[in-house]
Structures are given as C-alpha cells and as structure tokens.
A protein has these predicted regions:
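Small-residue (G/A/S/T)-rich helix-start motifs and N-terminal tracts that mark the onset
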Residues: 1-12, 89, 96-160
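Glycine-rich phosphate/dinucleotide-binding loop and adjoining beta-alpha-beta core of small-molecule
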Residues: 1-104, 112
Length: 160
C-alpha cells in the first residue's frame, strides 16, 4: 500500500474520513446488465480500513502522529475511544452529526477531541476553528516526541 511508504516520510497523517466502508463484491461489471430482472441483489464487502492499517504498520513507533475522525450520532466519547484503541491512533475527532447545525452540509461543527488521557469538548463553531484546534493538538504531540528525522523511513535499513 503506497500510503504506508508515504506515511513513513510524514510527521503526521490526518485521515478525515473513510473513502468507503464497503465496495461491490467482484468490482465493476465488464458488460451491461440486462434490465429484464425484476430485482437486483448487490453483495457488498468491507474495504481495507486504511487508518487501521496505518496504526498496525506504525506499531510502537512514535511517528507519524495518526489522527482519525468519527461521525457519530450518540455515545461520542465511548465510540471514539473504541476507535482510538482498535485503530491504534493518537487522536480521534468525534463529530456530533446528530444536530442540524453541525456536521454534514453546514459550515459549523460540534466535536470532541479524544486522546489516550483526555476528551476535550469543542462547542459549536466553525470547521476552520476545529481544524486549528486539531492541528494545535498534533503540534503538541509532535513537540513531545523525538524528531521524525531521527526515524528511518519505511523500507530503509541501517547497514552499519
């Protein structure tokens, strides 16, 4: 996966959303489907969870800082904490999408920024302000870790 190589060169990886959780089993059809069937059944299969793969790849290394997002309608903190653990990331930004004035198709958001120790509620505000807060947290995490330049990129080996 190319992203694993590129992640080795990054100080932080912020994955705003899954590209798709599912895809059609067998991929695109090579021929046009006839319209003579009264019903059609599609079988969907899970796609690779790129953020979880990054978390597994990183393992115990401290770089890059990994940030994921979770669009939730209830139990924001508990569901985001579960993602923090299962995906092995440093931060999860849990967006409360149960409100009409926050989340999708509006310029405002309500979120909770969650790490291993804290859950910081972010009140209704602009998405730009939320992004600034997330980047501030990433910067804080980076300042507490050894420089990424001291870590060999993926695929390189010390021959000494």
């Amino acid at each position: 996966m190319e992203i694993l190589h590129r992640a080795g060169e990054a100080d932080a990886v912020i994955m705003a959303a899954a590209v798709a959780d599912y895809t059609i089993d067998g991929g695109p059809q090579q021929t046009k489907m006839a319209k003579d069937r009264p019903t059609l059944t599609l079988t969907l299969i899970r796609t690779v969870d790129i953020l979880a793969e990054l978390g597994r790849w990183r393992g115990s290394r401290e770089h890059p800082v990994l940030v994921g997002f979770a669009a939730e309608t209830h139990d924001l903190v508990s569901r985001a904490r579960a993602k923090l653990q299962t995906k092995a990331v440093d931060l999860v930004v849990a967006n409360d999408v149960s409100r009409a004035d926050a989340g999708f198709e509006v310029e405002t958001n309500v979120a909770t920024i969650i790490d291993q120790a804290t859950a910081t509620e972010v009140p209704l505000g602009s998405k730009r302000e939320l992004a600034r807060l997330v980047l501030d947290r990433v910067g804080s995490l980076l300042s507490q870790r050894p420089s990424a330049t001291q870590i060999s990129p993926v695929g390189s080996h010390d021959s000494s």
